[in-house]
Amino acid sequence: VKEKIKNKTIHLPQFEMTILFLIHFLVGLDALAIVPFSSIMTSYVGADTAWSGYLVSAYSISAAITCLCVRGASNIRREKNRMLFFLAGIILATFFTTLVHDFTAMILCRVLTGIFGGALVVVNLNYVILRSGDENKKRNTAVLMSSLPLALAVGVPLLILLASGEDWRLAFQFLSVSLLLVSILFFGVDRFGDKHQIPNVTAPNSDLFSVSDAIKSRTAWFSILLAFSAILGTFAVSTQFPVMLSVNLGISPNLLSICYLMSGVGAFAAVQFYGRTKANERNVGLLILLLSIAMVVTVISGFQTKSVELASIAFSVFVVVSSTRTLVLVTELICSLPARERLFLISAQNSIQHLAVGVGGMLSSLVTYSKVNSTLDFSPLLYISSLLALSTPIIWYWHKKQ
Protein backbone atom coordinates (compact mmCIF):
# COMPACT_ATOMS: atom_id res chain seq x y z
CA VAL A 1 0.00 0.00 0.00
CA LYS A 2 2.80 2.41 0.89
CA GLU A 3 4.47 1.65 -2.43
CA LYS A 4 1.25 2.44 -4.30
CA ILE A 5 0.86 5.73 -2.46
CA LYS A 6 4.46 6.57 -3.22
CA ASN A 7 3.99 5.87 -6.92
CA LYS A 8 0.89 8.05 -7.06
CA THR A 9 2.64 10.83 -5.18
CA ILE A 10 5.47 11.09 -7.65
CA HIS A 11 3.21 11.01 -10.72
CA LEU A 12 3.26 14.49 -12.29
CA PRO A 13 1.20 14.73 -15.51
CA GLN A 14 2.68 16.77 -18.35
CA PHE A 15 -0.35 19.10 -18.42
CA GLU A 16 0.06 19.95 -14.75
CA MET A 17 3.81 20.48 -15.20
CA THR A 18 3.02 22.93 -18.00
CA ILE A 19 0.71 24.86 -15.68
CA LEU A 20 3.35 24.96 -12.94
CA PHE A 21 5.90 26.21 -15.49
CA LEU A 22 3.50 28.97 -16.58
CA ILE A 23 3.01 30.01 -12.94
CA HIS A 24 6.77 30.32 -12.46
CA PHE A 25 7.07 32.12 -15.81
CA LEU A 26 4.39 34.71 -14.98
CA VAL A 27 5.68 35.33 -11.45
CA GLY A 28 9.18 35.89 -12.86
CA LEU A 29 7.76 38.15 -15.55
CA ASP A 30 5.93 40.19 -12.88
CA ALA A 31 9.27 40.77 -11.16
CA LEU A 32 11.21 41.55 -14.36
CA ALA A 33 8.60 43.75 -16.06
CA ILE A 34 8.98 46.49 -13.46
CA VAL A 35 12.50 47.28 -14.72
CA PRO A 36 11.68 48.67 -18.22
CA PHE A 37 8.44 50.30 -16.98
CA SER A 38 9.79 51.78 -13.72
CA SER A 39 10.68 55.22 -15.12
CA ILE A 40 7.28 55.52 -16.85
CA MET A 41 5.46 54.42 -13.69
CA THR A 42 7.24 56.95 -11.48
CA SER A 43 6.49 59.73 -13.97
CA TYR A 44 2.84 58.62 -14.12
CA VAL A 45 2.37 59.20 -10.38
CA GLY A 46 4.32 62.48 -10.45
CA ALA A 47 7.48 61.19 -8.75
CA ASP A 48 11.11 61.84 -9.71
CA THR A 49 12.31 59.30 -12.29
CA ALA A 50 15.49 58.92 -10.22
CA TRP A 51 13.31 57.04 -7.71
CA SER A 52 12.43 54.31 -10.20
CA GLY A 53 14.86 51.89 -8.57
CA TYR A 54 12.75 51.92 -5.40
CA LEU A 55 9.93 50.19 -7.28
CA VAL A 56 12.31 47.34 -8.10
CA SER A 57 13.61 47.26 -4.53
CA ALA A 58 10.11 47.19 -3.01
CA TYR A 59 9.30 43.92 -4.75
CA SER A 60 12.72 42.33 -4.34
CA ILE A 61 13.28 43.02 -0.65
CA SER A 62 9.78 41.92 0.36
CA ALA A 63 10.19 38.77 -1.76
CA ALA A 64 13.60 38.07 -0.19
CA ILE A 65 12.22 38.31 3.35
CA THR A 66 9.25 36.15 2.39
CA CYS A 67 11.52 33.48 0.88
CA LEU A 68 13.32 33.26 4.24
CA CYS A 69 10.08 33.01 6.21
CA VAL A 70 8.13 30.61 3.99
CA ARG A 71 9.27 27.01 4.14
CA GLY A 72 8.09 24.26 1.85
CA ALA A 73 5.71 21.81 3.50
CA SER A 74 5.91 18.04 3.08
CA ASN A 75 2.14 17.64 2.61
CA ILE A 76 1.20 17.80 -1.07
CA ARG A 77 -2.43 18.79 -0.52
CA ARG A 78 -1.41 21.62 1.80
CA GLU A 79 1.09 22.93 -0.75
CA LYS A 80 -1.57 23.08 -3.44
CA ASN A 81 -3.94 24.99 -1.16
CA ARG A 82 -1.18 27.44 -0.26
CA MET A 83 -0.41 27.95 -3.94
CA LEU A 84 -4.03 28.87 -4.65
CA PHE A 85 -3.96 31.41 -1.79
CA PHE A 86 -0.70 33.02 -2.96
CA LEU A 87 -1.96 33.09 -6.55
CA ALA A 88 -5.05 35.01 -5.45
CA GLY A 89 -2.83 37.46 -3.57
CA ILE A 90 -0.44 38.19 -6.43
CA ILE A 91 -3.33 38.60 -8.89
CA LEU A 92 -5.00 41.24 -6.71
CA ALA A 93 -1.75 43.04 -5.85
CA THR A 94 -0.66 43.22 -9.51
CA PHE A 95 -4.07 44.47 -10.63
CA PHE A 96 -4.34 47.12 -7.89
CA THR A 97 -0.91 48.45 -8.94
CA THR A 98 -2.58 49.72 -12.12
CA LEU A 99 -5.25 51.63 -10.16
CA VAL A 100 -3.11 53.77 -7.83
CA HIS A 101 -2.06 57.36 -8.53
CA ASP A 102 0.36 57.86 -5.63
CA PHE A 103 4.00 56.75 -5.42
CA THR A 104 3.68 55.52 -1.83
CA ALA A 105 0.62 53.45 -2.71
CA MET A 106 2.45 52.05 -5.72
CA ILE A 107 5.39 51.05 -3.49
CA LEU A 108 2.94 49.33 -1.12
CA CYS A 109 1.37 47.39 -4.01
CA ARG A 110 4.80 46.23 -5.15
CA VAL A 111 5.66 45.16 -1.59
CA LEU A 112 2.49 43.05 -1.45
CA THR A 113 3.23 41.64 -4.90
CA GLY A 114 6.72 40.69 -3.70
CA ILE A 115 5.33 38.95 -0.62
CA PHE A 116 2.94 36.78 -2.62
CA GLY A 117 5.39 36.31 -5.49
CA GLY A 118 8.26 35.26 -3.22
CA ALA A 119 6.06 32.79 -1.36
CA LEU A 120 4.67 31.41 -4.61
CA VAL A 121 8.14 30.72 -6.05
CA VAL A 122 9.16 28.74 -2.96
CA VAL A 123 5.93 26.75 -2.69
CA ASN A 124 5.69 26.09 -6.44
CA LEU A 125 9.24 24.73 -6.60
CA ASN A 126 8.65 22.57 -3.54
CA TYR A 127 5.36 21.30 -5.00
CA VAL A 128 7.15 20.22 -8.19
CA ILE A 129 9.81 18.39 -6.17
CA LEU A 130 7.18 16.64 -4.04
CA ARG A 131 5.23 15.55 -7.11
CA SER A 132 8.29 14.33 -9.04
CA GLY A 133 10.02 10.99 -8.75
CA ASP A 134 13.76 10.69 -8.23
CA GLU A 135 14.29 10.03 -11.93
CA ASN A 136 12.37 13.20 -12.95
CA LYS A 137 13.16 15.53 -10.06
CA LYS A 138 16.26 17.10 -11.59
CA ARG A 139 14.67 17.47 -15.03
CA ASN A 140 11.45 19.03 -13.71
CA THR A 141 13.38 21.41 -11.46
CA ALA A 142 15.60 22.50 -14.36
CA VAL A 143 12.56 23.07 -16.56
CA LEU A 144 10.96 25.22 -13.86
CA MET A 145 14.12 27.29 -13.31
CA SER A 146 14.48 27.92 -17.06
CA SER A 147 11.29 30.00 -16.95
CA LEU A 148 13.20 33.09 -15.74
CA PRO A 149 15.50 33.55 -18.78
CA LEU A 150 12.52 32.73 -20.99
CA ALA A 151 10.51 35.48 -19.26
CA LEU A 152 13.36 37.89 -19.99
CA ALA A 153 13.76 36.81 -23.62
CA VAL A 154 10.09 36.48 -24.59
CA GLY A 155 7.83 37.89 -21.88
CA VAL A 156 9.40 41.32 -21.33
CA PRO A 157 9.62 42.23 -25.06
CA LEU A 158 6.01 41.14 -25.59
CA LEU A 159 4.83 43.27 -22.66
CA ILE A 160 6.74 46.28 -23.99
CA LEU A 161 5.15 45.86 -27.42
CA LEU A 162 1.73 45.26 -25.87
CA ALA A 163 2.00 48.46 -23.85
CA SER A 164 3.45 50.37 -26.84
CA GLY A 165 6.19 51.53 -24.50
CA GLU A 166 3.96 53.94 -22.56
CA ASP A 167 0.74 52.30 -21.34
CA TRP A 168 2.36 50.29 -18.54
CA ARG A 169 -1.04 49.66 -16.92
CA LEU A 170 -2.12 47.52 -19.86
CA ALA A 171 0.97 45.34 -19.39
CA PHE A 172 0.26 44.68 -15.70
CA GLN A 173 -3.45 44.17 -16.34
CA PHE A 174 -2.50 41.56 -18.92
CA LEU A 175 -0.24 39.93 -16.32
CA SER A 176 -2.99 39.76 -13.71
CA VAL A 177 -5.48 38.30 -16.19
CA SER A 178 -2.92 35.72 -17.34
CA LEU A 179 -2.26 34.71 -13.73
CA LEU A 180 -6.01 34.40 -13.17
CA LEU A 181 -6.44 32.09 -16.17
CA VAL A 182 -3.51 29.90 -15.11
CA SER A 183 -4.92 29.76 -11.56
CA ILE A 184 -8.25 28.52 -12.93
CA LEU A 185 -6.42 25.81 -14.88
CA PHE A 186 -4.40 24.85 -11.81
CA PHE A 187 -7.57 24.63 -9.71
CA GLY A 188 -9.25 22.61 -12.45
CA VAL A 189 -6.51 19.96 -12.42
CA ASP A 190 -7.53 19.06 -8.88
CA ARG A 191 -11.24 19.85 -9.18
CA PHE A 192 -12.02 17.94 -12.35
CA GLY A 193 -8.96 15.73 -12.77
CA ASP A 194 -8.17 12.35 -11.31
CA LYS A 195 -8.03 13.12 -7.61
CA HIS A 196 -6.12 10.00 -6.69
CA GLN A 197 -3.12 11.55 -8.46
CA ILE A 198 -2.74 14.11 -5.67
CA PRO A 199 -3.14 12.18 -2.41
CA ASN A 200 -3.05 13.83 0.96
CA VAL A 201 0.25 12.27 1.95
CA THR A 202 3.36 13.58 3.64
CA ALA A 203 6.83 13.11 2.23
CA PRO A 204 9.53 11.90 4.59
CA ASN A 205 11.62 14.53 6.31
CA SER A 206 15.33 14.78 5.57
CA ASP A 207 18.23 15.94 7.69
CA LEU A 208 18.24 19.62 6.76
CA PHE A 209 21.09 22.11 6.99
CA SER A 210 19.55 24.75 9.27
CA VAL A 211 20.21 28.48 9.50
CA SER A 212 22.12 27.94 12.76
CA ASP A 213 24.35 25.45 10.94
CA ALA A 214 24.91 28.00 8.18
CA ILE A 215 25.98 30.65 10.70
CA LYS A 216 28.71 28.32 11.95
CA SER A 217 29.85 27.25 8.48
CA ARG A 218 32.59 29.30 6.85
CA THR A 219 31.88 27.68 3.49
CA ALA A 220 28.21 28.64 3.66
CA TRP A 221 29.10 32.24 4.52
CA PHE A 222 31.48 32.45 1.57
CA SER A 223 28.91 30.94 -0.80
CA ILE A 224 26.26 33.43 0.29
CA LEU A 225 28.69 36.38 0.06
CA LEU A 226 29.88 35.39 -3.40
CA ALA A 227 26.38 34.82 -4.78
CA PHE A 228 25.18 38.10 -3.23
CA SER A 229 28.09 40.12 -4.67
CA ALA A 230 27.56 38.68 -8.15
CA ILE A 231 23.83 39.45 -8.23
CA LEU A 232 24.29 42.86 -6.57
CA GLY A 233 26.88 43.87 -9.18
CA THR A 234 24.45 42.88 -11.91
CA PHE A 235 21.27 44.55 -10.69
CA ALA A 236 22.88 47.76 -9.45
CA VAL A 237 23.31 48.47 -13.16
CA SER A 238 20.56 46.51 -14.91
CA THR A 239 17.81 48.36 -13.00
CA GLN A 240 19.11 51.73 -14.26
CA PHE A 241 20.35 50.80 -17.74
CA PRO A 242 16.85 50.78 -19.33
CA VAL A 243 16.01 53.95 -17.36
CA MET A 244 19.03 55.67 -18.90
CA LEU A 245 18.05 54.42 -22.36
CA SER A 246 14.51 55.75 -21.94
CA VAL A 247 15.10 59.05 -20.13
CA ASN A 248 18.48 60.21 -21.46
CA LEU A 249 18.51 58.71 -24.97
CA GLY A 250 14.78 58.34 -25.72
CA ILE A 251 14.97 54.75 -26.95
CA SER A 252 11.96 53.52 -28.92
CA PRO A 253 9.77 50.72 -27.49
CA ASN A 254 10.62 48.48 -30.45
CA LEU A 255 14.38 48.86 -29.97
CA LEU A 256 14.07 48.30 -26.21
CA SER A 257 12.08 45.11 -26.77
CA ILE A 258 14.74 43.93 -29.24
CA CYS A 259 17.39 44.58 -26.56
CA TYR A 260 15.55 42.36 -24.09
CA LEU A 261 15.00 39.70 -26.75
CA MET A 262 18.68 39.61 -27.72
CA SER A 263 19.74 39.67 -24.06
CA GLY A 264 17.49 36.77 -23.14
CA VAL A 265 18.46 34.68 -26.16
CA GLY A 266 22.15 35.42 -25.61
CA ALA A 267 21.96 34.53 -21.92
CA PHE A 268 20.06 31.33 -22.71
CA ALA A 269 22.65 30.33 -25.34
CA ALA A 270 25.51 31.06 -22.94
CA VAL A 271 23.83 28.96 -20.26
CA GLN A 272 23.43 26.05 -22.68
CA PHE A 273 27.06 26.29 -23.82
CA TYR A 274 28.43 26.40 -20.29
CA GLY A 275 26.27 23.45 -19.24
CA ARG A 276 27.87 21.33 -21.96
CA THR A 277 31.49 22.20 -21.17
CA LYS A 278 33.85 20.97 -18.47
CA ALA A 279 36.30 23.40 -16.92
CA ASN A 280 38.81 23.10 -14.11
CA GLU A 281 39.00 25.49 -11.17
CA ARG A 282 41.65 27.70 -12.77
CA ASN A 283 39.68 28.15 -15.98
CA VAL A 284 36.51 28.93 -14.02
CA GLY A 285 38.33 31.66 -12.09
CA LEU A 286 39.71 33.11 -15.32
CA LEU A 287 36.25 33.06 -16.91
CA ILE A 288 34.75 34.90 -13.91
CA LEU A 289 37.50 37.54 -14.13
CA LEU A 290 37.02 38.07 -17.89
CA LEU A 291 33.24 38.32 -17.54
CA SER A 292 33.67 40.87 -14.71
CA ILE A 293 35.98 42.99 -16.87
CA ALA A 294 33.47 42.77 -19.72
CA MET A 295 30.78 44.05 -17.34
CA VAL A 296 32.88 47.11 -16.47
CA VAL A 297 33.63 47.85 -20.15
CA THR A 298 29.98 47.60 -21.23
CA VAL A 299 28.77 49.76 -18.32
CA ILE A 300 31.25 52.57 -18.96
CA SER A 301 30.81 52.51 -22.74
CA GLY A 302 27.02 52.21 -22.56
CA PHE A 303 26.46 55.05 -20.09
CA GLN A 304 29.02 57.40 -21.67
CA THR A 305 27.97 57.18 -25.32
CA LYS A 306 25.38 59.50 -26.85
CA SER A 307 24.38 56.95 -29.48
CA VAL A 308 21.23 55.05 -28.60
CA GLU A 309 22.28 52.18 -30.89
CA LEU A 310 25.68 51.72 -29.21
CA ALA A 311 24.12 52.03 -25.75
CA SER A 312 21.54 49.40 -26.70
CA ILE A 313 24.27 46.99 -27.80
CA ALA A 314 26.18 47.64 -24.56
CA PHE A 315 23.02 46.92 -22.54
CA SER A 316 22.40 43.62 -24.33
CA VAL A 317 26.01 42.50 -23.93
CA PHE A 318 25.99 43.49 -20.25
CA VAL A 319 22.92 41.34 -19.55
CA VAL A 320 24.50 38.36 -21.31
CA VAL A 321 27.91 38.53 -19.57
CA SER A 322 26.48 39.34 -16.13
CA SER A 323 23.87 36.56 -16.36
CA THR A 324 26.53 34.09 -17.47
CA ARG A 325 28.82 35.10 -14.61
CA THR A 326 26.07 34.60 -12.04
CA LEU A 327 25.18 31.21 -13.51
CA VAL A 328 28.80 30.03 -13.49
CA LEU A 329 29.31 31.14 -9.89
CA VAL A 330 26.11 29.63 -8.50
CA THR A 331 26.60 26.38 -10.42
CA GLU A 332 30.20 25.97 -9.25
CA LEU A 333 29.21 26.74 -5.65
CA ILE A 334 26.32 24.29 -5.61
CA CYS A 335 28.33 21.49 -7.20
CA SER A 336 31.29 21.95 -4.86
CA LEU A 337 29.30 21.93 -1.60
CA PRO A 338 28.51 18.85 0.52
CA ALA A 339 24.97 17.50 0.15
CA ARG A 340 23.43 19.17 3.23
CA GLU A 341 25.00 22.58 2.54
CA ARG A 342 24.08 22.26 -1.12
CA LEU A 343 20.39 21.87 -0.25
CA PHE A 344 20.59 24.92 2.01
CA LEU A 345 22.15 27.08 -0.71
CA ILE A 346 19.55 25.98 -3.26
CA SER A 347 16.72 26.92 -0.88
CA ALA A 348 18.41 30.19 0.13
CA GLN A 349 19.23 31.21 -3.44
CA ASN A 350 15.83 32.81 -4.10
CA SER A 351 16.14 34.93 -0.98
CA ILE A 352 19.74 35.92 -1.80
CA GLN A 353 18.73 36.84 -5.34
CA HIS A 354 15.74 38.96 -4.33
CA LEU A 355 17.70 40.69 -1.55
CA ALA A 356 20.60 41.50 -3.88
CA VAL A 357 18.20 42.81 -6.53
CA GLY A 358 16.47 44.98 -3.93
CA VAL A 359 19.69 46.39 -2.52
CA GLY A 360 21.03 46.95 -6.04
CA GLY A 361 17.92 48.85 -7.10
CA MET A 362 17.93 50.97 -3.95
CA LEU A 363 21.67 51.68 -4.20
CA SER A 364 21.42 52.71 -7.84
CA SER A 365 18.56 55.11 -7.06
CA LEU A 366 20.48 56.66 -4.16
CA VAL A 367 23.46 57.54 -6.39
CA THR A 368 21.43 58.73 -9.40
CA TYR A 369 20.61 62.44 -9.64
CA SER A 370 18.31 64.54 -11.81
CA LYS A 371 19.74 67.29 -14.02
CA VAL A 372 18.12 70.60 -14.87
CA ASN A 373 17.43 69.41 -18.43
CA SER A 374 15.25 66.54 -17.11
CA THR A 375 17.94 63.93 -17.79
CA LEU A 376 19.69 61.81 -15.16
CA ASP A 377 23.30 61.83 -13.94
CA PHE A 378 24.67 58.30 -13.50
CA SER A 379 28.33 59.25 -12.91
CA PRO A 380 28.56 57.96 -9.29
CA LEU A 381 26.89 54.71 -10.35
CA LEU A 382 29.65 54.00 -12.89
CA TYR A 383 32.36 54.01 -10.21
CA ILE A 384 30.34 51.99 -7.70
CA SER A 385 29.19 49.40 -10.25
CA SER A 386 32.76 48.92 -11.50
CA LEU A 387 33.97 48.24 -7.96
CA LEU A 388 31.09 45.83 -7.34
CA ALA A 389 31.77 43.94 -10.58
CA LEU A 390 35.48 43.53 -9.79
CA SER A 391 34.85 42.57 -6.15
CA THR A 392 33.37 39.21 -7.16
CA PRO A 393 36.54 37.72 -8.76
CA ILE A 394 38.57 39.14 -5.86
CA ILE A 395 36.37 37.28 -3.36
CA TRP A 396 36.58 34.13 -5.50
CA TYR A 397 40.41 34.13 -5.65
CA TRP A 398 40.69 35.05 -1.96
CA HIS A 399 38.56 32.08 -0.94
CA LYS A 400 40.48 29.67 -3.19
CA LYS A 401 43.78 30.78 -1.65
CA GLN A 402 42.38 30.16 1.83
Language model features with spans:
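Juxtamembrane intracellular "pre-TM" segments in multi-pass secondary transporters
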Residues: 2-11, 191-224
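Extracytoplasmic gate region of multi-pass secondary transporters
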Residues: 34-35, 219-260
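Conserved MFS/SLC helix-loop-helix module at the cytosolic interface between two early adjacent transmembrane helices
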Residues: 65-101
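Cytoplasmic helix-loop-helix junction between adjacent transmembrane helices
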Residues: 103, 109-148
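Helix-loop-helix hairpin linking two adjacent transmembrane segments in secondary transporters
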Residues: 134-136, 142-191
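A membrane-interface helix-boundary motif in multi-pass transporters
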Residues: 164-176, 366-389
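C-terminal transmembrane helical hairpin of 12-TM major facilitator-type secondary transporters
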Residues: 284-329
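A late C-terminal transmembrane helix in Major Facilitator Superfamily
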Residues: 339-372
